[in-house]
Design a protein with these regions (language model features):
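Alpha-helical transmembrane segments of multipass membrane proteins
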Residues: 35, 39, 82, 86, ...
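Aromatic-rich transmembrane-lumenal/periplasmic boundary elements in polytopic membrane proteins
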Residues: 127-195
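Inter-helical loop and helix-membrane interface segments of multi-pass membrane transporters/permeases
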Residues: 1, 37-77, 104, 108, ...
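Early transmembrane hairpin of solute transport permeases
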Residues: 1-102, 110, 279-302
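Transmembrane alpha-helical segments and their short flanking loops
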Residues: 194, 202-214, 234-242, 256-260, ...
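Individual transmembrane alpha-helix segments
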Residues: 178-181, 187-192, 203-232
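Membrane-interfacial loop-to-helix junctions in multi-pass transporters
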Residues: 3-4, 111-116, 149-160, 209-213, ...
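Transmembrane alpha-helical segments in integral membrane proteins
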Residues: 6-18, 78-99, 179, 221-248, ...
């Protein structure tokens, strides 16, 4: 659920950090709601069902309204983009009203109230406008998805999948892509011995694992996540931790580092790390993005196709954890793939540790230790 509400959390946090004013935060929350209300009433109904989601329970019965639509109306998912739109209008409203003079037309209206109403109205109009633009955004990515799905055995297609998947994850759209590739025909299909058809990479893997059949046709979209969660993320955390030079800070962060590494290995914490990299170390994120894409392209060629057995909502799915991997250890069908995965994982750990250490020590020391150069200068 944290992933689902991440855009709203990001919005409220960003507004509060800039203004530290409770009324501006309230304005952002109400503007976010009005933004999705505007989308709900004007949203097209011909988009894939995966792109629609009820934000904060926002929905309406179309039969009670004067509309051509039927059923329950819900807004389409806007992810982090929607939060950024509302953030812009909330901040601009707050800043413009700071410059308001006592002689303005609406000087009799309290400034805080003006911020709230202006943010709500502008966000509502932005939501309505977005309903005319958003279908082009959706169709653009649908064309990319269709291109990728035409040949999931092609390393180039898998390379593109890796890049698109991680970029959409940052924008809070990965659940849409995952739903299509995990459980629909875009991820492939497989007919079991009794004639039942199973679709999607995760759907096929779940069925094949239940029948003790090697997932030679599935698992390729999940395998890289094992390496990233179990090896890459812990390496990044440990390397970043080692760049702290203050012994007191170093000691205080040890419990957090242990917890973060454990969470990544047991449950997967790839997304929070990626978001951190986007805002603090874009170059390091670029390295991570292309290395992830390379893993998607190379692992199937090496025979490493270890999937994720799951049948629930993609929003709560946590693929790539060591718990899922331990289930496969005793199965002789997957032992060769596990050995290769372990070897590549160890190489990945060393690579991420080296790249992260070099980046923070030589290229971006100020991000983690902003006063380190200053201190060294004064001491000398």
């Amino acid at each position: 659920m944290i992933v689902h509400y991440f855009p709203l959390i990001f919005l409220l946090r960003a507004v509060y950090r800039r203004s530290e004013d409770g009324m501006v935060v309230l304005a952002a929350l109400l503007a976010y709601i009005s933004f999705h209300v505007g989308i709900m009433f004007f949203t097209p109904t011909n988009l894939p069902t995966e792109v629609y989601t009820s934000v904060l329970g926002i929905s309406a019965n179309a039969s009670l309204l004067v509309t051509k639509n039927s059923g329950i109306l819900v807004p389409f998912h806007t992810g982090l983009i929607g939060a950024l739109v509302v953030l812009y209008f909330t901040r601009s409203s707050a800043q413009s009203l700071k410059k308001r003079t006592p002689y303005s037309v609406f000087s009799f209206v309290d400034k805080n109230v003006s911020v709230v109403f202006r943010s709500i109205i502008l966000s509502l109009l932005a939501g309505i406008l977005l309903t005319f633009i958003w279908p082009m955004f959706i169709n653009f990515f649908l064309n990319i998805f269709t291109f990728i799905s035409k040949d999931l055995n092609n390393p180039i297609n898998l390379f593109i999948y890796g890049i698109v998947n991680r970029l959409l994850s940052i924008l809070n759209f990965s659940h849409w892509m995952n739903q299509l590739f995990w459980f629909s025909n875009l991820g492939g299909s497989w007919v079991d011995p009794v004639g039942a058809v199973h679709t999607g990479d995760v759907g096929m893997w779940t069925a094949q694992l239940a029948r003790n059949i090697s997932g030679f046709t599935s698992g390729k979209l999940i395998s890289p996540l094992y390496i990233l969660n179990i090896f890459a993320v812990p390496a990044f955390i440990l390397a970043a931790f080692q760049t702290y030079t203050d012994k007191l800070v170093h000691k205080r962060l040890i419990p957090f580092v242990i917890l973060a590494v454990s969470m990544s290995i047991l449950f997967g914490t790839l997304l929070p790390i990626e978001i951190f990299l986007v805002f603090t170390a874009p170059l390091l994120f670029t390295f991570h993005l292309f290395f992830t894409a390379i893993l998607y392209a190379v692992l199937p060629m090496l025979g490493v196709t270890l999937g994720y057995s799951f049948t629930g909502n993609v929003l709560v799915g946590t693929p790539g954890s060591i718990i899922d991997l331990l289930v496969l250890i005793r199965n002789p069908i997957y032992q060769k793939a596990l050995v290769i995965l372990l070897f590549i994982g160890l190489m990945t750990f060393l690579l991420y540790y080296a790249v992260t250490s070099y980046y923070y020590r030589r290229g971006a020391i100020s991000i983690i230790n902003p006063n380190e150069k200053e201190i060294c200068f004064k001491e000398s």
